[in-house]
Amino acid sequence: MAEAGDENLYAAARDIARALGKDPSAAGDILQILSGYGASGNRGGDPRPTPSRGGSNVNFDRALTSLERQISSYIVEDRPIWSDPVDSRTFLDSVDELLAIAGDLRSMAGDKSVAVCQSRADELIQQVMFRLQEEFGFVMDRAPDSFDSDDEFPGEEDNDTSDGVIVARPITDYKIVIEALQSSVIGDLNAIAVRMVAGGFAKECSRVYSSRRREFLEESLSRLHLRGLSMEEVQESPWQDLEDEIDRWIKAVTLIFHVFFPSERLLCDRVFSDLPVSSVTDLSFMEVCRGTTTQLLNFADAIALGSRLPERLFKVVDLYEAMQDLIPKMETLFSDRYCSPLRHEALAIHKRLGEAIRGIFMELENLIRRDPPKTAFPGGGIHPITRYVMNYLRAACKSRQSLEQILDQTGNETGSDTRPLSVQIIWVLELLESNLEGKKRTYRDPSLCFLFMMNNDKYILDKAKDNELGLVLGEDWIVKHAAKLRQYHSNYRRSSWNQVVGLLRTDGPYPKLVENLRLFKSQFDEVCKVQSQWVVSDGQLREELRSSVAGIVSPAYSNFIRRLKESPEINGRRGEPFIPYTVEDVEFIIKRLFKESSS
């Protein structure tokens, strides 16, 4: 009868508390007052005694019987205990008492007389823990409903939900924290977590928590428009598609590591506060982040292990730099022993991206070596391989600091002032020039060989001036290359015009002068006809060449004509010999040398 009275008394307490507006604190006060009375309502002994260490087996038995009755009444209910604040408070009080008794029993483990009670307590704790595990999930599942309709994520007017999961919208301010759960919900979760850890169910509690939070992160990641490609899919996808995916990946990973993961860490710290050890917090945070982190890292790893085609350099460098920027954040967020494998994997992938970039430079070298001379390039203009390599290197040098770090494999232990990127690029340019030397041999006209080299070297020099590429190459390289360009210019002028101008010597007899004039016209016409079809794309170089040619031909021709007219042999003759061109005619024809393009 006394036991039935106890049940009626506690049932009455719950009814009174509900009538007072479901105030958990009021419920606790009422339960505390009424728990001191027996079934008759008189103040009496505690119906659920907590024996001292030396207490009798009978006291333990009575206490466990009372707890079994009260706890079982909650466990058998289909309705969630945490749907009612009074019930949750009462249930936690019973759990606390059960854990206290179990602790006393464990301290008396050597006493065979309490073995049966200890077994009963352990069995009841198992039942309680399983129910708390369910309740923990219930509280997390109902968390979105606890938000007011006006609650919003920063930077958005609407707060989307999908299947009860709060979904983060795109934001631009990384110095924010997502308050995914209200303080009251966090308090409930913490209360359950403290009991589950005390009951030996820390991993189970962590598992329930992390599964719910992973769902939030996965849904949020999908809203960032990442395709979630497997490593095989990355390897098979067209590079143009992957370029777009890399851009989305960089934005997503920045947001994840600067906003979402720090917010999840703070939430873990609050939910699992007041625990005797931090391992539950660290384990839970790792489990929450592991799936998302692995997905992000797998994509970067697939890119790192993919093709080394030269056109991939720039996006791979973007990935490398994004990882580089995130490493300090990872070092902070993933500092504990549970997260250290994620941190180490990120560092390894960052290293593999660097290896991929070095491999891409090697493939660029091979591309230059494999580019065959084939047939002569029309007009001796700038070869496509020259344009490709120079624009490539110029674009690459925009990431100069990263490339310096990547290419410095030895850490410059020799103390040399030579920078690894400078060495690499100069080597690529040497390969390019060697390739161009092979291509110039396809021209039968030596003058066109020199013009071809002049065109390409002028393009190389112009691309290296006044930009990051020039800073990498250094002033000495530019000065030496300018001298080489002048030498090509001199060689062209000598091979093209020395023989033509040589016909304008004035030290021969009159008949010889007349013959030389005829030969000059023939050769001059032929050279100008041919070279008017040659290509000099650079306007400045084109004018310099024309001026240079005019500078040696015009004075020689003018002097020759004057000498011819003044020759004594023409005295007494009728008129002067036939002179095909005036000096102005020669200069006009020279101005028609070369064209801007081969089209």
Swiss-Prot record:
Please provide an example of a Pfam family that matches this protein in its UniProt record.
Answer: Exo70_N
Write out the ranges of the annotated region (Disordered). Answer: 38-58
**What tissue specificity is annotated for this entry?**
Mostly expressed in leaves and, to a lower extent, in roots, cotyledons, internodes, flower buds, siliques and anthers.
Localization, per the record, is:
Cytoplasmic vesicle, Phagosome; Cytoplasm; Nucleus
Its biological purpose is as follows: Component of an exocyst subcomplex specifically involved in autophagy-related, Golgi-independent membrane traffic to the vacuole. Regulates autophagosome formation and autophagy-related Golgi-independent import into the vacuole. Positive regulator of defense responses to pathogenic bacteria (e.g. P.syringae pv. maculicola), to the biotrophic oomycete H.arabidopsidis and to fungi (e.g. B.graminis hordei), especially in cell wall apposition formation related to plant defense. Required for both immediate and later responses triggered by pathogen-associated molecular patterns (PAMPs).
The entry assigns this protein to a family as follows: Belongs to the EXO70 family.
Protein name listed in UniProt: Exocyst complex component EXO70B2
